Amino acid sequence: MKKALIVIDVQAGMYTAGMPVHNGEKFLEILQELIGECRSNDIPVIYVQHNGPKDHPLEKGTDGWKIHKAIAPLEGDCVVEKTTPDSFHKTDLKEVLQDKGIDHVIISGMQTQYCVDTTTRRAFSEGYKVTLVSDAHSTFDTEVLRAEDIVKHHNVVFGAFADVITLKDLKETVSK
């Protein structure tokens, strides 16, 4: 199986939106390590970037819209722009994956209960083998749930659609 890493919506505006990202700095460190591991195993990294409406923290073209500098794309990396929680809906993600011969996606990013959830389910429905890195997705606290609980809950639910593994476990199997 040919793999690709998808990094969803880890944009500067997520870190300036007025709410702290759950395990924010550690999350970025994990993503850096995950991206590095994939690059060293010739696994392409595909960034998904949300285009928010005017005055939104992720408004297209603003500083908040940019991919977070800690994990910024390198020259030649693919960036797919989207306007909905589904990274496949009205984007060229499926075509990018097909052009690269990808049949196994590794998913990471933000926000767990929105874009990571929707993209994980859609990738499964599109027929991809899906791996979700359980410590490489995050979100914010909400009015009803703490971010930590959202992440834990989704790591259980995602098991119906994906292999849910830690970065440590992924590193042991990524080259296979």
PLM feature segments, named:
Residues 20-49:
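A short alpha/beta connector and helix-capping loop motif
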Residues 18-24, 108-111:
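Short, glycine-rich nucleotide/cofactor-binding loops
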Residues 1-10:
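Short coil-to-beta-strand
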Residues 13-17:
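Short acidic, Gly/Ser-rich segments with clustered Asp/Glu that frequently serve as metal-coordination loops
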Residues 18, 52-56:
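Glycine-rich, proline-tolerant flexible connector loops at the mouths of alpha/beta enzymes
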Residues 3-4, 32-36, 41, 58-176:
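Active-site-adjacent betaalpha module
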Residues 7, 44-50, 133:
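Short beta-strand segments at enzyme active-site cores
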Residues 50-51, 110:
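Short, well-ordered beta-to-alpha junction loops that form the rim of enzyme active sites
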